[in-house]
Amino acid sequence: MSINICRDNHDPFYRYKMPPIQAKVEGRGNGIKTAVLNVADISHALNRPAPYIVKYFGFELGAQTSISVDKDRYLVNGVHEPAKLQDVLDGFINKFVLCGSCKNPETEIIITKDNDLVRDCKACGKRTPMDLRHKLSSFILKNPPDSVSGSKKKKKAATASANVRGGGLSISDIAQGKSQNAPSDGTGSSTPQHHDEDEDELSRQIKAAASTLEDIEVKDDEWAVDMSEEAIRARAKELEVNSELTQLDEYGEWILEQAGEDKENLPSDVELYKKAAELDVLNDPKIGCVLAQCLFDEDIVNEIAEHNAFFTKILVTPEYEKNFMGGIERFLGLEHKDLIPLLPKILVQLYNNDIISEEEIMRFGTKSSKKFVPKEVSKKVRRAAKPFITWLETAESDDDEEDDE
């Protein structure tokens, strides 16, 4: 038996089908859960990763979920009838599968260079945006599909230089229109390739400025750079102190100046992002620490969700998350000690909105550090996280017991 992917479509010749949801209730008491048995089949029919579907159930039903792709086991806490889950799945299909123009399900999720989500329709050719305010959008941005087309996201390169702005090319390469993936002509040179859609703003600005300059002949034998380990460390330290720190300080001061003492005039998320790009601090993980200290006041628990989409766009790696949590630690331990008891609620918001990963929250709550605050302050703050950490550990142990059965 199969049903229409778009259940509102009653055309007898409608050819897009999927299996109906199959589910069964497991356990009893506080540990009762609903196992969704055929998520993999539904995932295949919708061309969407199975975790997206289960996470959507969790967000819409207000329930915790357990996802084990390897074991093909997907659980949603609580009792949920298949009919109810099918209705919730309709919402997922409308928001994250069907084309916003022709309502055809032949779409792929595209993550653009600006970290926006769009549905690329293979039927009508249109691209329609998805709602970034939905919690699942944050999850998708942090866990992109295996094959992301359109934005042509590349896997992390093996060298650090390949992951910086400009694709690891020198300024002169960018000015000459060379691309990181430009084919070689056999002489070591590359053929210019123009990808205006993927090219970042900084590269375009460099090209525009460089096009007005005369060619300069560089003779390799006229100068040399000391590449000893000591010299590299010295230069790195000097750059960090004189450039990065200054730019981050300027960014933090700008936020506080714009917001005012009561923070009623806090810049919008768009303005915050544009200013960070202008000061070139988006690639510095320490921006997370600055944001955590500058954006919040006594109402931090409610304010976190207001910036959900922005944080998802900024906190793109564990290092960014670690710095953000360090900023939270400074905010509570040094500036608002009276708010330390609210830390479990703060962690709930960060966890439920997929801003900070479970791994980073566990690390933060179980090990003190003197990186951001004095050791004693760190212990006091992180000790307050214990109720939430205990809940996380209990949830994990319950899932393990279910798997053993």
Swiss-Prot record:
Family: Belongs to the eIF-2-beta/eIF-5 family.
Keywords: GTP-binding, Initiation factor, Nucleotide-binding, Phosphoprotein, Protein biosynthesis
Subunit structure: Monomer. The factors eIF-1, eIF-2, eIF-3, TIF5/eIF-5 and methionyl-tRNAi form a multifactor complex (MFC) that may bind to the 40S ribosome. TIF32, NIP1 and TIF5/eIF-5 comprise a minimal 40S-ribosome-binding unit. Interacts with NIP1. Interacts with SUI3.
InterPro entries: ARM-type_fold (IPR016024), IF2/IF5 (IPR045196), Transl_init_fac_IF2/IF5_dom (IPR002735), Transl_init_fac_IF2/IF5_N (IPR016189), Transl_init_fac_IF2/IF5_Zn-bd (IPR016190), W2_domain (IPR003307)
Gene (UniProt): TIF5
SMART domains linked to this entry: eIF2B_5, eIF5C
Name used for this protein in its record: Eukaryotic translation initiation factor 5
UniProt-annotated binding residues for GTP: G27, R28, G29, N30, G31, I32, K33, T34
Lineage of source species: Eukaryota, Fungi, Dikarya, Ascomycota, Saccharomycotina
Anything else known: Present with 48300 molecules/cell in log phase SD medium.
